[in-house]
Amino acid sequence: MQRRSLLRATGAATLLAAAPFIRAQGALQKFKFNLGWKVEASGAGFLLALQRGYYKDLGLDVQIDTGNGSASAISLVGGGAYDSASADLSSMIEFNLANPQAALKAVAIQYDLNPNSVIVRKDGPIKKPGDLAGKTILGQPFNASRKLFPVFAKAQGFDPSGVKWENVAPDIGDTRFVKGDFDAAAYFFFTGLLNLKARGMGPEQLNVFRFSDYGMKSYGNGLVSNPKSMQDNPDAMKAFVKASTHGWLDCIADPKAGAAAVKAREPLANEALELERLQLIVDGTMKTPDTKANGWGAATPARLQATIDETAAAFGLKSTLPLADFWTDKFLPSAADRKLRG
C-alpha cells in the first residue's frame, strides 16, 4: 500500500499522460500477452509488473498466458489472438517473410545478447566450436539454437551440414545427454544449464558455446506485436511496453522479487531454481554495454540489420525485410524510464 500511495502522490500526472484512453473509456483497456513459454524466470519481468500493479496503473487489464515456443507465439500474435508476445526475433523475420500480410513488428528488445548456445561436457572430446563438426547434437527442428547454428558454424570455419541432429523431446533428451547419448545440446544457455543441473550435471561439468561470444550480433527475444493492436490502440501498446520495462528493471535490480513473482504465478515452481535462472538471464542477456548505454528494450540500427542478415543466412531466406518492417521504437518509454538501476 505504501508503494502505491507514493506512486499516486508522485506520478499521477505521468500515468495519465501515458494512458489518455483511461479518461475517454472510463475503464481498463484489455490487453493479451503470451509469454512464449511456460511460467519461469524468462517471464519474470512481466509477472512482476502484473503483481505490482504497473499495468493497471497505466490503464491496462493485462492477461498473461503461457506459450509453446516462439513459432507458436508468433503465429498466435499474427492471427490476432494476442496483442503481443515474447518471441525470438529471427523466427519473427522468417514468419513475416512467409506471411507478408502479418506485418508483425518488434516494439522492444528483451534479450539484448542472444541466448542461443551449444552445450558440451568439459570432460568430452569437444574443446572448441570447430570440434562440433560431424558430431551428434540434441535439438528439435523448432529449436532456435538449432535454426541459427549454421551462422555460428560458418563463423567458426566448419560446415554445419555434417552435424547429425537428434529430434528428441526436451525432457527425454536432457536425460539422454547426461547419459552420454549425444555429443552436445543446443539450447538457450540458461535453459540448458538448469535443465541439466536438475538431472545431476552441474554447470561446473559443462562448457557453453554462446553464439554471442563467437561473433553473432543478432538480438534474442523481443516483444513481437500485432499491427492492428499497434494501429488501433497505440496508447495501450505504449502503456504495456512502459509497464513491462518497469517490471524488468525491477527484476534486474532485485532478482529475488522476480523469482517470487514466478512462484506466485506458478506454485509448483522451484523458487531457488528460478532465481538462479533469472540471475543468468539478467547477467547474461540484459546487463550489457548497450543496455547500460541505451536502456532496457532499446535497439541500434546496426544490430537490427545484423539480426536480419544473420537470420537470412541461417534460414536460407531469398529475401529480407527493411528495418522499418521489422522494428519500431515509437512505443518505447523515455530514456529515463528505460535506465538500468542495478
Name each region found by the language model.
Residues L304-G342:
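Conserved C-terminal helix/tail region of periplasmic/extracytoplasmic solute-binding proteins
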Residues P160-K164, P203-N207, L268-Q279, K318-D325:
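Short, surface-exposed acidic
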Residues Q25-K179, D183-F190, F209-F211, M216-K217:
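Short, glycine-/small- and polar/acidic-enriched structural segments
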Residues S5-A24:
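N-terminal export signals
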Residues D232-A314:
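Secondary-structure end/capping motifs
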Residues Q63, A71, N167, F209-S212, ...:
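Short linear loop/turn motifs
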Residues D131-G134, F177-V178, G222, A243-T245, ...:
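Flexible glycine/proline-enriched surface loops and loop-helix/loop-strand junctions
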Residues D171-T175, F182-L268:
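Pocket-lining segment of extracytoplasmic ligand-binding domains
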